[in-house]
From Swiss-Prot:
Gene3D superfamilies (alphabetical): RNA-binding S4 domain
InterPro entries for this protein: Ribosomal_uS4, Ribosomal_uS4_arc, Ribosomal_uS4_CS, Ribosomal_uS4_euk/arc, Ribosomal_uS4_N, S4_RNA-bd, S4_RNA-bd_sf
Assembly, per entry: Part of the 30S ribosomal subunit. Contacts protein S5. The interaction surface between S4 and S5 is involved in control of translational fidelity.
Domain S4 RNA-binding: 106-158
One GO cellular component term: small ribosomal subunit
Species, as recorded: Pyrobaculum arsenaticum (strain DSM 13514 / JCM 11321 / PZ6)
Role this protein plays: One of the primary rRNA binding proteins, it binds directly to 16S rRNA where it nucleates assembly of the body of the 30S subunit.
SMART domains: Ribosomal_S4 (SM01390), S4 (SM00363)
Protein name: Small ribosomal subunit protein uS4
Keyword annotations of the record: Ribonucleoprotein, Ribosomal protein, RNA-binding, rRNA-binding
Family membership noted in the UniProt record: Belongs to the universal ribosomal protein uS4 family.
């Protein structure tokens, strides 16, 4: 993280090198509309998280089988509990094929919309920010909250 006086931005790993690439701009705009993101920083944060996951999977693949054995299963279980993969027994190659949509699908805003609690993805964001969504009875006001698999069923609408 660096020194306390010079904190580093969390999204720098996900920020593109060439910001004005037309293809990338169109792709980002499409993702922002589909997932109701407020700005590109939210997308870059998701990309940074994905980059961390793929980097870790790549480092595990480069290890020998004996070195990899004690580290691989906890990593896969962590991804499964977070909801990024469907089965904790998937091969590491499958983890490398994850894209940013896997991360964006776990955001509270997206899950509230997919559950049918909101009419649109933007309505879901407004419900969350205004404090009308609770997880296990606790109000969550951050639309970017990554919902773990175990809490997905405990999302409720609070009036």
């Amino acid at each position: 993280m660096g020194g306390l006086r010079k904190p580093k931005k969390k999204y720098l790993a996900g920020k593109p090198k060439k910001i004005w690439n037309k293809q990338l701009l169109l792709e980002e705009l499409q993702l922002m509309g589909e997932y109701g993101l407020r700005n590109k920083r939210e997308l870059w944060l998701a990309r940074a998280r994905l980059k961390w996951i793929t980097r870790r999977a790549r480092s595990l693949l480069s290890m020998t089988a004996e070195e990899r054995a004690p580290l691989e299963m906890p990593f896969k279980e962590k991804l499964y509990k977070a909801g990024f993969i469907e089965d904790p027994n998937v091969p590491l190659d499958r983890i490398l094929s994850l894209d940013v949509r896997a991360i964006l699908e776990r955001r509270l805003q997206t899950i509230v919309y997919r559950m049918g609690l909101a009419k649109s993805i933007y309505h879901a964001r407004q419900l969350i920010v205004h404090g009308h969504i609770a997880i296990e009875g606790r109000r969550v006001t951050s639309p970017g909250f990554l919902v773990p698999r175990e809490l997905e069923d405990k999302i409720t609408l609070v009036q």
